[in-house]
């Protein structure tokens, strides 16, 4: 069965400079997927021409005249940018022309737009940003990672339900364990919201492990870790910074002299395997222990997220992305201008 995905081609810090090459690469590896690139046709076509590669019949362009900027408020995006690439991509899902949408755009605007257009399932107040993070034991689902800065105990319970459902569908684990991120494992720790959420989780049908601490995220203590969006986002960005530092330090040490360069060459297979283990498994849908991309199967519909949020500074995986300005805003990549 062919899966159709609508891609917000203008989203992210670079826009079409990343999304279009990545889309072309993706189609080369996934013959059972169709992509709809949503955005400004001229910018998309110019990028396709620059790539100078045969155009797949599974790639189409859908026009959208507006772009949601990274500093647009969710309210402004909803009210004033109804023809944005983000909004149109999500509309295609609602209309049944696509089964899912992908965007690397403004997080707040994306969550607000998706909630407004697609709604939430009964019993769920707010959507949450979830991610599968690598751990010592495989991967764990962590949510919320930034969609909801302030949460009620009831919403944290809902996040637990969503996370457990997601990781069951992705990994095939039955009765996954759910932990509540806290400053200590003892029941007396945490603020009132966390304590009340723990009580709700404990009395639910979920396999509630109890409170977990920050170090448990990567130890793989539980299958699902629940937290509010503020704490989750700080934890995620801290992890990204640490990973960047470790990578940079390794590069410096291996490049110190001829002997260390030769050592790096000898260690290359180990380093590649190490990097592979750390790569996010979030898009590797698993069924029967194997990634769905190898099986040509679509995730079960009732457990399938309808849209994906990508990192705003995400880059194409193959050749390095050149310095470019965003075609919709004319601005260089935020936070990494001049970087190669």
Swiss-Prot record:
UniProt keywords, alphabetically: Cytoplasm, Lipid biosynthesis, Lipid metabolism, Phospholipid biosynthesis, Phospholipid metabolism, Transferase
Uppermost EC category: transferase
Keyword Hydrolase: no
Protein known as: Phosphate acyltransferase
GO cellular component term, pick one: cytoplasm
Biased composition (Basic residues): 300-325
Task of the protein: Catalyzes the reversible formation of acyl-phosphate (acyl-PO(4)) from acyl-[acyl-carrier-protein] (acyl-ACP). This enzyme utilizes acyl-ACP as fatty acyl donor, but not acyl-CoA.
GO molecular function: phosphate:acyl-[acyl carrier protein] acyltransferase activity
Gene Ontology annotations of biological process type: fatty acid biosynthetic process; phospholipid biosynthetic process
Superkingdom, natural source: Bacteria
Record's subcellular location: Cytoplasm
Stored HAMAP family: PlsX
Assembly and binders: Homodimer. Probably interacts with PlsY.
Protein family membership: Belongs to the PlsX family.
